[in-house]
Amino acid sequence: MAEAKYEPRLKKEYVERIRKALQEQFSYANEMMIPKLDKIVINMGVGEATADSKKPTVAAADLAAIAGQKPVITRARNSIAGFKVREQMPIGAKVTLRGARMYEFMDRLVNIALPRVRDFRGLNPKSFDGRGNFAMGIKEHIVFPEINYDKVDQMWGMDIIVCTTATTDDEARALLKEFSFPFRQ
């Protein structure tokens, strides 16, 4: 007997409901024109990396727990004396999620992490880049359930960029609204 292949909840919802809703709303000529999620990039910059070189590895470990995938340590491209940064010095971590991990992360982000953010009033609907990608920032990484609040010695912020195949911001906004992103009114 063949085992049932795992499919993330949001991907199933996209295939069964969201594609049809977007097709009705924008009446695309071709089924391949319907926008979909391409990737999610999570970036965590560590400003204190100049004083302590171990900070980026600690941040990378937290980011790995959040994303479920090993992050890449980002390094400074050039030296900036004012910030005490040297070329090739580790200054942060980033991870690119695609496929099932992307849908799982988005599910946790929308349903668990964003409601736990203090004084959350909704996402800024103007944070689109003009080409269908959405960027947002989170000030504290402890809103994710994978991070144990008691074991955290320092809180870091992170940038989350949701890349879609949509060509306009309106299409991307409609796609993310269907995924129940809580946009500000």
Curated annotation (Swiss-Prot):
Gene Ontology BP, a term: translation
Gene Ontology cellular component terms for the protein in this record: ribonucleoprotein complex; ribosome
Alphabetic keyword roster: Ribonucleoprotein, Ribosomal protein, RNA-binding, rRNA-binding, tRNA-binding
PROSITE patterns documented for this protein: RIBOSOMAL_L5 (PS00358)
GO molecular function, one term: rRNA binding
Classification via Gene3D superfamilies: 3.30.1440.10
Pfam family, one: Ribosomal_L5_C
Subunit structure and binding partners: Part of the 50S ribosomal subunit; part of the 5S rRNA/L5/L18/L25 subcomplex. Contacts the 5S rRNA and the P site tRNA. Forms a bridge to the 30S subunit in the 70S ribosome.
NCBIfam families: PRK00010.1
Family: Belongs to the universal ribosomal protein uL5 family.
Job of this protein: This is one of the proteins that bind and probably mediate the attachment of the 5S RNA into the large ribosomal subunit, where it forms part of the central protuberance. In the 70S ribosome it contacts protein S13 of the 30S subunit (bridge B1b), connecting the 2 subunits; this bridge is implicated in subunit movement. Contacts the P site tRNA; the 5S rRNA and some of its associated proteins might help stabilize positioning of ribosome-bound tRNAs.
PANTHER family noted in UniProt: 60S RIBOSOMAL PROTEIN L11-RELATED
Protein name, as recorded: Large ribosomal subunit protein uL5
Species in which this protein is naturally found: Rhizobium johnstonii (strain DSM 114642 / LMG 32736 / 3841)
Gene that this polypeptide is encoded by: rplE
